[in-house]
Structure formats: structure tokens, C-alpha cells
Amino acid sequence: VRTIRCVPLSIPYQGLLEVQGECIMRLSTLEAYNKTADEPLKNARNAAAGALRNLDPAVTARRKLDAFFYQIGTIENPPYHDLDGMIAFLQENGFPTSRYEAHATTYDEIVQRIDAVEAQRESLDFLIDGAVVKVCDLQTRQAMGNTEKFPRWAVAYKFAAEENTATLLDVTWELGRTGKLTPLAHLTPTDIGGVTVKRATLNNFGDIQRKRLLLGCTVWIRRSNDVIPEITGRVEDGSTGSEIAKPTVCPACGAPLVERGANLYCVNRQTCRPQAVARLAHFAGRDAMDITSLSEKTAGQLYDLCGVRDPADLYHLTREQLLSLEGFQDKRADNLLAALQKSRDCALDAFLFAIGIPNIGRGTARDVAGHFGALAGVMNATQEELLEIPDVGDIVAQSVVEFFSFPEDRTMVERLLAAGVTPREIAKPSAD
């Protein structure tokens, strides 16, 4: 964040202060960057997010990011009582704020203000997908409070997504780490909001049938929230085409597919390369076991050259095996072995996320770990016990129970434990 030049490195205010804002890459900055970049960036949102996640501050600095600040979360003795005062305080301390603000006291005025923002949307030098309506008075905000996820004193209004038409050329099937196949639509290039769209997502084969899609037909394309292109339906223009075949075997390994609910799955976990490699890379990720030097490319080499088929195999790798990989010399091999050793002592929530339980993100893994305290409790939990956890619903509870009931998954976990991986238990608060 220190590489974002508009963020002040020192401020006049003395005391504890937490400010909240949003990082952006201006469209003009993106255009200038792409003129000289070896690998042009696809869009400003991804460019900003990727820059902040990058471990090299020099890469972040080259993106020339900006930021807008809009909220103070924590402050000692705030010298203001409403939003106007808060924004003025931010400005006085050198934090850039948005100039696109307006007051309203009636519903009609709110609609007018939103329409005015939308009218300026195309002329802005940064991407927006809506406008936020907020209560100004801070005491009123405090009285209204918050839900588990959102403040009750603010609501985001999303603009209608931009749409265009394209011809559906082909449908291929992408394989994820869980073995689920997801259809990917290939389209004639079409411009939506300044972005050339050539591919779009479909949910499953049932989605293809519901939308009556055919190869060669004209379809509506929408970029939801200006980010993810999706096919919303077929254009009723009399266009015809050929049926889209439902796959019966895995496109990667040729194994028979099975249906689970609305989705198709390849159950060949061990020798289906794409899902095995994706599973290894996920296991090693920063939010999972945080095994540095183990990228998806390295996972692919480990699969091809070292016989690594699931995460437990990682802990049996030798230095000699690593030195046989492309790009690995003594230091990198030693670093990976050290990272593997370090990962043996891991947080329970990180472990639960790393093993790839479907529908379990890091936040849910943290909730589940905190509730049960130990891996054994999670592995033997019933659906009813899981439903006692706030924010855990039927789908998540069923996913956990099914994961540990599958012999392949349970065996993988047991092999990890046998290899010395030890998820730390969490002390649960006493009943009294």
C-alpha cells in the first residue's frame, strides 16, 4: 500500500486511526501501462487486485494505483458527528476522497442522484458498477447497527449490466480440483463496456438446456457487475444451429463421468492430471498450507516427474527429486523442503480449507474449526452438529459430511496425518 502514491505516509492527526478505502487503477493508467507491457493487463479491476496481492512491491508500484477513502472504522474521540465531517477529516489528513457525492432527503431525490451518477459513468476514468446510499448522521448509524455481513445504514444500488450479442461457436468443458466439469462458451469477439469478450461462463449442462443454446446460434452476453461475462439467453432471431453434446467421459483423462445433482464429475482423482494438479496447487496456497515455491506450474512438474498424486505425496519428496525439476537448483529445492516441513504444524482452519472440502472457504473453515476445536470432531461430525454453527447451512453441512464419508478423501487426510501434518487444536471456551 505504501507504493500507492496518493496514500499519505504521515498525517497531522495524533492517535489511533483506521481508515477504509478502495484501491483502483485508472483507465488512462491501464492504457498507458499496456502500451509498453510485455503482458498487457486485461482490465483495471483485475490489474489493481493483482498488484496488491503481488509479493514484489516494485510490481505494485509499476501499476501506479490510486485509492479513494470513504470511511473511518476506528478513531479516538472523533472530531465530527456526520458523514460530511468524516470526509472533511479524511481530506484534512491527506486521504483522497471521491468528489461524486450528493445529499438527498427523499426517495425521489435519491433516484435522481443515482441517475446523475450513472449518466457520468462512461466519462469516468475508473470503473464503477453502482452507487451507495448512506445515512449521514453517525448516531443514527449506530442505532441502526449491522447485520452479520452488512451495515443497515447503507445499501448499494447496482447499475444494470451492459449487454451485447455474439455467436456461440463452441462449448468446452473446464475441469476443477473437485472433478466438477464447468462448460465454457466460446464466442465471436464482442465489445461490452470497452472489453472484448470471447468467452463466457455457463453453470452446467442444465443451464445450456434451459437457455436452449445451440452451436451457431446468436446469444445475449452480459458482464455481471462489469466483471464476469455470462450468457443470459438465446436471441430469438430465427437463428439455428447444432445441438451441444452432453459429455459422457472426462475430456482430460477419458474416465466415465457421474452426475451429482446438476453437475457432472470426473471421479478419477488420482490419474486425472488437471484436477490432481489443481488440488495440489490449492493445498499449497497462501490461504491454505502456505507452501512457498509450490506454484501450479511446479505442481504440474511434480505430477509428471515425481509421481505426486495427492497432497500427502508432497511430504515424501526428496531433494534429489526436486533438483530434477525445471528451474530448481539447490536453494529453491531447500526452500521448498523447508516450507513443507514448516507446513506440518498448521492451523486447523487452514488445514480444513487446504484439503479442498467443496463449498468451504477460509471463513467457513475458521467457523467450523472454532466450533469443534479438533480435526477428529470435524471428521466425525453429523449434519445436525454442523448446522449448529452460525452461517453454516444445509449445503455446507452436507459437503463436510460427504467429504469425510468418501474413502478417497478420508484416506488422503489419514495419509497427511501419518506424514506428520498436525493441525493445531483450538481451545474451546469452558461451559461456565
Each language-model region and where it sits:
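Helix-hairpin-helix/helix-loop-helix acidic hairpins
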Residues: 375-379
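Solvent-exposed, charged helical/coil patches
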Residues: 399-402
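RNA/tRNA-interacting regions in translation and RNA-turnover enzymes
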Residues: 1-348, 352-359, 364-371, 385, ...
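Short, solvent-exposed loop/turn elements at beta->coil junctions and helix N-caps
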Residues: 427-431
